[in-house]
Design a protein with these regions (language model features):
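Core catalytic lobe of class I
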Residues: 1-130
């Protein structure tokens, strides 16, 4: 069964049973200052890292053994999220997928990178091939 959940991730994740999810696809704010009307994309560094640790810890809790997670992330924080997932939470890195854009994007008078990273990690239990 596929169930899509829409809401604040920290609230919604806490309501999900531990070890009950096979796959998570997450596209959190990239913390690049984009105006979504709620200030969620313009935090100072420490607050953004704490926020990331919080929701990734919940993802780690709800994933089944052998479950996988794909995290879309901007270039500024990919190494930090990798560190949280691999070193802090013990997830196993499978691959780094690059989502390449074919058009130039400009926002706030800045040229945005032509690609974004997707971290593909897994919990123990399956032989994942990247």
């Amino acid at each position: 069964m596929i169930e899509l959940i829409h809401g604040d991730c920290l609230h919604e994740l806490k309501a999900i049973d531990s070890n009950s999810v096979d796959l998570i696809v997450a596209d959190p704010p990239y913390n690049v200052g984009k105006d979504y009307g709620n200030g969620s994309d313009k935090q100072d560094f420490d607050d953004y890292i704490a926020f990331s640790k919080s929701w990734l810890s919940e993802c780690n809790r709800i994933l089944k053994r052998g479950g996988t997670i794909y995290v879309f992330v901007g270039f500024r924080f990919i190494s930090y999220l990798y560190q949280i997932m691999e070193m802090d939470l013990g997830m196993h890195f499978v691959n780094w997928i690059s989502w390449h854009y074919t058009q130039v994007c400009v926002e706030n008078d800045s040229i945005l990178p032509p690609s974004y990273g997707i971290l593909y990690d897994a919990l123990d239990g399956l032989d994942h091939k990247g």
